[in-house]
Structures are given as C-alpha cells and as structure tokens.
Regions:
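Glyoxalase I/VOC metalloenzyme domain signal
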Residues: 1-9, 13-34, 48-101, 116-185
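Long, hydrophobic/aromatic N-terminal blocks
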Residues: 34-46
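Internal, conserved structured core segments that host functional sites
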Residues: 103-105
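Short acidic/glycine-enriched loop/turn segments that link adjacent beta-strands
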Residues: 39-42, 108-112
Length: 185
C-alpha cells in the first residue's frame, strides 16, 4: 500500500438531470450548490466546501460525458483524490493493477492531474496534486459498489480503503444518511 498521504476530494455521479438529483437530495437538508455550466456538462456540488463532497454531473448533448452515459447509463463516474506529489504517488502505485488513462499524458503536465482506470472497475480515479491536503471530516463517509476482492485490493492500494466498501448496490453514506444512487436518476 502507498505510504503517501491521500485525501478524498469528491465523488462524481453522472445523472440524467442535475436539477432532479439535487431536488431529491433536498430532503436531507444538504447544502446544494449552484448549477454551473461547463463545455460538456452541467454540474452541482453538494457540500462543495467540505472534504469529500458529492458532484452531480449532467451530460450535455455531445462530448465524452454524453458518450459515457449512452454507453453505461447514469451512475458513478469518478472518485477524485488529492495528493501532495503526483509523480511520487504514480510511482507508488506501479504494479498495483491501475492503468493510466492516455489523456493523463497531457493533464499531468497541464493540470497536475492523472486519471486511473481499470477494465471492469466502475469508476475513474482522478488524482490531483495539491499544495496542502484538508483534514476536515468527510461529508461522504463511504461508498458501496459491487467490487471483487482484486478491485478492493486496488482501492486499498491508492488509499481509499475507508471510502470504498463492497456490496451489490451502489450506495453513498453521507452525513449519517444512506442513499442508493438510483434515487438520483
């Protein structure tokens, strides 16, 4: 397992409608951020100022997010983590089973961000280099997903053993509340 410090940043869920998903979360009295528009997505952060927030993403009519939702449907898109030194982190996971997405060649240089993937793994792992790592309590306490023993080992290797747990359904445990991801669709 990596000896490097890792801090969960956010968990992103690709949904058909960020407005509908945000409305579903209002019953929990979560802090729902403003809807933002980007080149390929509409996005809303839930408890965006807290460590390990929830990011709701809606694909626009074209682009990579639209292709993702058409291919796999709505659901978990990525889990973002922060590290102090991206190159040391990437060196530390050599041989762990994670693969570096080809887009990372450009994003490592331009944005100090890498994308880890693995066929069959239900999400992308976004690794961002930061100057400091927050130590505040988590908003998202855990995420359950149908993971194999090998996938759990890979998750542990990148410092997410406290976030990911294996279960047959995708659920998020936030601020003492449990939500099946399907409720956001």
């Amino acid at each position: 397992m990596s000896q490097l410090q890792v801090s969960p940043s956010h968990i992103a869920v690709l949904v058909p409608s960020v407005d509908k998903a945000a409305k579903q979360l209002q019953k929990f009295n979560f802090e729902i951020g403003l809807k933002e528009e980007f080149q390929e997505t509409f996005e809303i952060y839930v408890h965006g100022e807290k460590r390990n927030s929830l990011l709701l993403m809606e694909a626009k009519s074209s682009g990579s997010y639209r292709k993702a939702i058409e291919k796999r449907g709505p659901g978990l898109h990525h889990v973002a983590i922060d590290v102090l030194n991206l190159n040391l982190f990437l060196d530390s996971i050599a041989g762990s089973g994670w693969l570096l997405n080809l887009n990372s060649i450009k994003t490592i240089e331009d944005y100090k961000t890498a994308y880890l993937v693995r066929p069959g793994f239900p999400a992308i792992i976004e690794v961002q280099q930061k100057d400091t790592l927050p130590m505040a309590p988590f908003f998202i306490e855990s995420l359950t997903a149908p993971l194999s023993a090998q996938q759990l080992k890979m998750v542990n290797h990148i410092g997410l053993k406290d976030i990911f747990q294996s279960h047959r359904d995708f659920t998020i445990h936030m601020n003492n509340q449990t939500l099946n991801l399907k409720e956001l669709f």
